[in-house]
């Protein structure tokens, strides 16, 4: 078939180049797993197709010429050319591009999300390391853009890390939907051959299949969930970066030499541009949600390009922006330094005025009256207008006293901060273990897939042996003693 030049340029060629660059390994994985399942069912030439696919994937895929419309038919035509039509046709029994494409898409996006979670963990680790290195360093925090109360740098950074941890959790939770395998759904009604869809999912390292076969090819919520999680991340990062830029503006945060740029005209300039670029990437994440929602909005619940091939390029761009935002923020933290003296630049008696109110209340003055008396003693919180000794007021309003009185859970007190740091480090360690287990599951599946049917059967046999040993061990433990 001769495709129109405009269609070739903007659709077929563009999609083929993207698939050739990003999706080919996932197509081969899905086709190999499917051929292995057909071979298990005893369908003719399926075992030969497994071998052919394993050999073919070592060769470069041809560039787009317009002779075939997509990567699947490029693989199919090569199979037919080198191994014959019967072998090529073997993998098409019951297989639709609907379930095949979405299996490859989900596997690709899953790998990208897993990699991004790793970047996320590195940033959280950097935040905690910088917080630990600046434990107890005081600074003045603001509310409504005005100086409010003292805190410490580690207390502030622990708050930022807590926000980022929730963003990490939301991104991690996208795998509950994304890490499910559509293969075996065929066009939409299910495969006409009795393939084991749970086995297919396991072969490809997925957590399990998308159960309903229409849902497997029709749903686009996996893309929406991912875009939503990335938008949340972009919002959180932009707030942190805005704070760092405000500190950099007054010299309290000095960006590392390799992350700042000068001016082509003003020789004195040393601009903290790494923070600006990180915030640009974070902003792109916020805008992505609208794009993905539009691609799903007002579309019928069935297989469509809108929420299959249509979401791949925008999601890929968003994942690239997320990686850039996380990594730029991380190196900005690791390669820059805070200036403690300038962090306290806004410290004044007024910043501790609430402590004077508390002191009067503790002496029996009604709160409303104490509040008015302190307001009347401003600026400077003059002790003679409060009816307290100067030395007592100075001691009460010291930073040390302020922090010591705030040993509540999550507070700025030294003990509370140390305990919060220990909890944050423990959560980070657990998240690293969880991510490592997920990576190991996918790596194992790919290793077994590369070995062919024998490798997967051997693994299943080992699992059965291990399970039997566990059962026997439990039975032995349950035997009555004596």
Please tell me what each predicted stretch does.
Residues 1-30, 64-68, 87, 251, ...:
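Glycine-rich cofactor/substrate-binding loops
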Residues 1-180, 184-190, 195-197, 262-263, ...:
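A helix-coil-helix interface module used to build multimeric assemblies
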Residues 43-44, 206, 365:
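Helix N-cap/coil-helix junction residues
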Residues 97, 210-214, 349, 357:
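A structural signal for small-residue-enriched, beta-sheet-centric alpha/beta enzyme cores
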Residues 50-53, 204, 248, 257-259, ...:
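A general structural motif at alpha-helix termini
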Residues 105-121, 125, 132, 146-300, ...:
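Charged, flexible cofactor/metal-binding loops and thiol motifs
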Residues 462-479:
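Intrinsically disordered, low-complexity, charge-rich segments with an acidic bias
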